[in-house]
Amino acid sequence: MAAEGSTQQRRRVMAAASAASTSGAGRCRLSKIGASRRPPPARVRVAVRLRPFVDGTAGASDPPCVRGMDSCSLEIANWRNHQETLKYQFDAFYGERSTQQDIYAGSVQPILRHLLEGQNASVLAYGPTGAGKTHTMLGSPEQPGVIPRALMDLLQLTREEGAEGRPWALSVTMSYLEIYQEKVLDLLDPASGDLVIREDCRGNILIPGLTQKPITSFADFERHFLPASRNRTVGATRLNQRSSRSHAVLLVKVDQRERLAPFRQREGKLYLIDLAGSEDNRRTGNKGLRLKESGAINTSLFVLGKVVDALNQGLPRVPYRDSKLTRLLQDSLGGSAHSILIANIAPERCFYLDTVSALNFAARSKEVINRPFTNESLQPHVLGPVKLSQKELLGPPEAKRARGPEEEEIGSPEPMAAPASASQKLSPLQKLSSMDPAMLERLLSLDRLLASQGSQGAPLLSTPKRERMVLMKTVEEKDLEIERLKTKQKELEAKMLAQKAEEKENHCPTMLRPLSHRTVTVAKPLKKAVVMPLQLIQEQAASPNAEIHILKNKGRKRKLESLDALEPEEKAEDCWELQISPELLAHGRQKILDLLNEGSARDLRSLQRIGPKKAQLIVGWRELHGPFSQVEDLERVEGITGKQMESFLKANILGLAAGQRCGPS
């Protein structure tokens, strides 16, 4: 018995410990929810469609180069080794006998349900030109494609989920655009011109100015879509008589608004994309405009391949911005959408290289990981009246302190007006007349409950009316007194400033006149001063018979005026100039000429601006032509220009004239 009791006791202790650990783990999970939880990954699903042979194409009678193995795999001949085949595995493979309904029901229809959960989805048709992408997306009246089937089912789902009595109200809008030569054009409004692609603060891709048409039925969709489809750019090439020259994108938005509290709002987007096909211009024979269009198409598809490779390799930079197409597909590839890629291929052997390229791109694309999440938020206009009602619960003094200065200037009702009743004060529905009737009825019932409970707990509303009026009057008197004090303070400050200005004028009589009363005079250009060497000045001063006046005073232009009347520009003018006597200049020139005719190469290098090479040139010229007759003959020496001659004279003539040693040593 004792053993059984101890066993039961141990079991109870273990159970309690297990429960405690479980509850602790639960609390830990609850505390981290929303902060560390990431949306589950969703891989890009890839389906391959093989179109049948087209009559009139080259090689239509040859056996196909692609063969399906089962519903998910296919094989194609290896061009490097004809004895082998290349095998590919995808999420779905649709052969030549597959119908439009098979492709839609097997790959596209399952993702439409995510739109009603506030998530994004996208369907892309990829492949070379003439492989059947547009037929897959649009189809024909007898065999409608993915776009009409998806819109028909989506509108049916929104009607069922948004019916009366259901918790959500749904609305659907559509936009249709094309990317033609790196320009985003609105097909619903062709006159709008090139549009820009933006990204909001939450990372959502949007196009400002893009037309949005509300649709409630498939007839509404056809009324907008069919005329817009005729605006898409198409052209004829050797391989395709109606080749798409642009990427077409149909954007369908599903907005959901909750009818009851907490009044959530969801938005789901569906991208239906018909990509233009890659082209080999050697086979299509494109020239002129067609060649330019083909270059833009191939460039954007090349960037699309770079984006897929960057996502698969985990590179830090994904080149979404290198092309308008990849910028628009940022949600679809590596973003927040459930994506389906339908790769269209052709069976003819002339399309072999294009088919291999499309299959390789599809194989890389199925490795891309997206992280879809629900785009959900609360309606902002529901929270506004509640905040207003909290201010209204306060009395006039408290409310006045709670309001900012801007609200005080805009103003509220007159303070002396009769206060409203308690039910009007507590009502948060004073500005909700434009709301949904069902939502308004629900909030009215909540308002009545709030009014019945709030009248018991609001101390200000229980205050007698006479006391409130006296209190409001006191507050007004204090406000008026504050305004009077502010006005008086401003007057005193103005008087103090005026007194300081007068004191400055009295203590500074020599102050310059204000700029508005000064007359501006342009200073005359200063005369150049010729500077004499100091050694020469001393020699001339020491000579008793010196009659050379080095400095000649030109005299004052006018007598100095008083300091008050003298302008700064006039003070700056100097009336002295320096001149050199012509005898000194002639003496210096003669010394230079003697040195040129009699000096050796070493002596010539003692002159300024004369180096070893020029000294040798001067000696050689002197031996051939004889002595120099004047200093200017130095310009005749080969290698000495006129400018060099001028700089030579300026550098040497004054020093030599002053008696510096320049003769042969």
From Swiss-Prot:
Lineage of source species: Eukaryota, Metazoa, Chordata, Craniata, Vertebrata
Annotated keywords: ATP-binding, Coiled coil, Cytoplasm, Cytoskeleton, DNA-binding, Isopeptide bond, Microtubule, Motor protein, Nucleotide-binding, Nucleus, Phosphoprotein, Ubl conjugation
Gene Ontology molecular function: any one: DNA binding
Subcellular location: Nucleus; Cytoplasm, Cytoskeleton
Subunit composition and interactions: Interacts with FAM83D and SIAH1.
Source organism, top-level taxon: Eukaryota
PANTHER family: CHROMOSOME-ASSOCIATED KINESIN KIF4A-RELATED, KINESIN-LIKE PROTEIN
Gene name in the database record: KIF22
SUPFAM superfamilies: P-loop containing nucleoside triphosphate hydrolases (SSF52540), RuvA domain 2-like (SSF47781)
Family of the protein in this entry: Belongs to the TRAFAC class myosin-kinesin ATPase superfamily. Kinesin family.
Species per Swiss-Prot/TrEMBL record: Pongo abelii (Sumatran orangutan)
Binding site for ATP: G127, P128, T129, G130, A131, G132, K133, T134
Biological process annotations from GO: DNA repair; metaphase chromosome alignment; microtubule-based movement; mitotic metaphase chromosome alignment; mitotic spindle organization; sister chromatid cohesion; spindle elongation
Cross-linked residues, Glycyl lysine isopeptide (Lys-Gly) (interchain with G-Cter in SUMO2): K465
Function: Kinesin family member that is involved in spindle formation and the movements of chromosomes during mitosis and meiosis. Binds to microtubules and to DNA. Plays a role in congression of laterally attached chromosomes in NDC80-depleted cells.
Residues annotated as domain Kinesin motor: 43-368
Residue list for modification Phosphoserine: S412, S427, S452, S543, S562, S581
Annotated protein name in UniProt: Kinesin-like protein KIF22
PTM statement from Swiss-Prot or TrEMBL: Ubiquitinated; mediated by SIAH1 and leading to its subsequent proteasomal degradation.
Pfam families hit by this protein: HHH_3, Kinesin
InterPro entries named in the record: Hlx-hairpin-Hlx_DNA-bd_motif, Kinesin-like_fam, Kinesin_motor_CS, Kinesin_motor_dom, Kinesin_motor_dom_sf, P-loop_NTPase, RuvA_2-like
Region (Disordered): 1-20, 393-424
Biased composition (Low complexity): 412-424
Coiled-coil annotated spans: 465-508
